[in-house]
């Protein structure tokens, strides 16, 4: 992602991706 909220967006994206892998 990009933009001024990259840190927040990146953290959320990481959590979503991790959750997606765990609950596949």
Curated annotation (Swiss-Prot):
Its main location: other. One of its GO terms (molecular function) is bacteriochlorophyll binding. Belongs to the CsmB/CsmF family. It comes from Pelodictyon luteolum. One of its GO terms (cellular component) is chlorosome envelope. It is found in: Chlorosome, Chlorosome envelope. This is Chlorosome envelope protein B. The keyword Magnesium does not apply. Keywords: Bacteriochlorophyll, Chlorophyll, Chlorosome, Chromophore, Photosynthesis.
